[in-house]
Amino acid sequence: SATVNGVEVAVQEQVAVMKPFCRLLRFKRFTDNPKALEVMKSQPTVLVVAPLSGHHSTLLRDTVKSLLHDHKVFITDWTDARMVPLDEGPFHLDDYVSYVQDFIRLIGPEVNVISVCQPTVPVLAAVSLLASGGEFTPRTLTMMGGPIDARRSPTAVNNLAMNKSHSWFENNVIYRVPPNYPG
């Protein structure tokens, strides 16, 4: 539940879109209180793009809870790639960007987008491509904690990337999914 305009309202998690590598979740709020209902109808819509790698949208539970008081909330819920059957095909950066574009289009031109950490670059790319194609873009774009230009604040991860070849990464950090998983 969430409190809207001083009224406790019910919240139901719904799957708005199901794709092989991600579910778009909507948190639908319900109330019989006419004043709270009017307030909810006028509140902005936000899409929270959660990190894909090593995280799940459940880690942003508190963020969603706080947004529900004064926003219509959607969030990406990325599927662990090892759980996606091979026949669904690969999932690359361009697929990630395309998913984000599809979600923005579905929600509509009034959407506000928040990307948290890792998805800042794909979200920026998605919005930039929408704009360059003459499509609507989100009302706002908030990118939290993600490196847009990682050269500006290099970390040990950046140093590793700069000091190793592409083939080193292919040979040392890409692993086959164990046979007991569909991916």
Predicted regions and their residues:
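Short, surface-exposed "cap/lid" segments of acyl-processing enzymes
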Residues: 2-84
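Beta-sheet entry/capping signal
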Residues: 45-46, 72-74, 110-113, 139-141
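Catalytic nucleophile loop
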Residues: 47, 77, 111-126
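An acidic- and aromatic-residue-enriched active-site/binding cleft used to recognize and process polar
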Residues: 52, 78-81, 116-121, 146-147
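Conserved acidic catalytic loop of the alpha/beta-hydrolase fold
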Residues: 83-85, 95-112, 124, 128
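Conserved catalytic-core motifs of eukaryotic protein kinase domains, centered on the activation segment
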Residues: 85-86, 154
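Short glycine-enriched, charge-decorated loop/helix-capping segments at active-site entrances
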Residues: 87-91
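Alpha/beta-hydrolase-fold enzymes
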Residues: 109, 122, 126-183
